[in-house]
Amino acid sequence: HLEFHKDFETYRSDKANLFRALDLHDHVKVIAGEKVKVPSIGIVNLEDPSASYFISATKKNVYGFTTMGKAGKAAAETGSDACELPEIPENIRYMTGKNIASARYGLCFSVDCDGKSSFYPENYDAVLPREHENLNIQANLPGSFNAYNIMASIIAVSSVANLSFSEVASKTQSLLPVKGRMTVIDKGQMFEVIVDYAHTPSSFETIFPPVRKRCKGRLFAVFGSGGERDLTKRPIQGEIAGKFCDIVVLA
C-alpha cells in the first residue's frame, strides 16, 4: 500500500495506530445475545521485524506468535541467504508453531503455548516457571503460512470469547477454506492447479516456498499486476516468481 502511505515509516506508523487505539477503550462484543466487555489485547507476529515497534505502541498486554522461521518467507532461505529473525522481546507471552506439515488440502502442526489462554495473570513477570500447554492442530487450510493465521485466530478467539487455547484449537478441523486463498482446482487433470489472491512481494515470498518444496515436477506461475497503483512491486514480484518457479507467465 505504499502508493497510499508513500513510505514505509508512514505505513508502519499508521499500522501502529491500531495498537495505540487499544489504550483508548476496551471492546464491547455481543456474545450469546449479551453485551460483554472484552479487555483489549494486542496480537503480533514475532517474526515481523517491526514486532517490537508495535508492542511498544500500546500499554495493553500483547500476545505473540511465531514459527521460529519454519513457515512463510523465513523458511524459504537457507545458509547465507537465511532470514535473520528479530529477537523476541522479554516478558511477552507467545505461542510457537512447530513440526509444520502442509499438504494439498490442509496442514497440521503442534503449538507450544505460554499459558492456557490469552488472559494475562496478575504479576505475570514474576511467575516462574511459567505454565505451558501443547496443542495439536489440524486444519483444511493448505499452505504452511496458514500456521500464522491459525495461531493468531486462536489467540483472538480466546480473548474475545474467554475460552482456553485448547477449546479454540479443537475447532480448527471445522475451518472452511476461503475461496481464492490457496484454492485447489481439481477437474481430474494430471497436474495440480492452485488459485491464490497473492498480489504483493511479501505474499509471493509466503506462498511459493511451501508449494516449491512439495512440487515433484515443474512449477508454473501465472500472474499479472494490472492498474496503475504500485508500479514498483512489479519487477520484485517477477524476480521472486522466477526464483521459485520453472516458468512464469505474465498476464
Identify the function of each model-found stretch.
Residues 1-192, 216:
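Acidic, Mg2+-coordinating active-site environments of NTP-dependent enzymes
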Residues 139, 197, 223-225:
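Short glycine-centered, acidic/aromatic-flanked micro-motifs in structured strand/loop junctions
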Residues 1, 48-49, 200, 225-228:
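Short glycine-rich anion-binding loops that position phosphate/pyrophosphate groups of nucleotides
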Residues 52, 202-205:
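Alpha-helical elements of the RecA-like P-loop NTPase motor core of helicases
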Residues 168, 204-207:
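Hydrophobic side chains in well-ordered alpha-helices
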Residues 177-180, 202, 209-251:
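Active-site beta-alpha connecting loops in nucleotide-dependent enzymes
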Residues 152, 199, 203:
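Conserved cofactor-binding/catalytic machinery of classical short-chain dehydrogenase/reductase
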Residues 193-199:
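Switch II (G3) loop of P-loop NTPases
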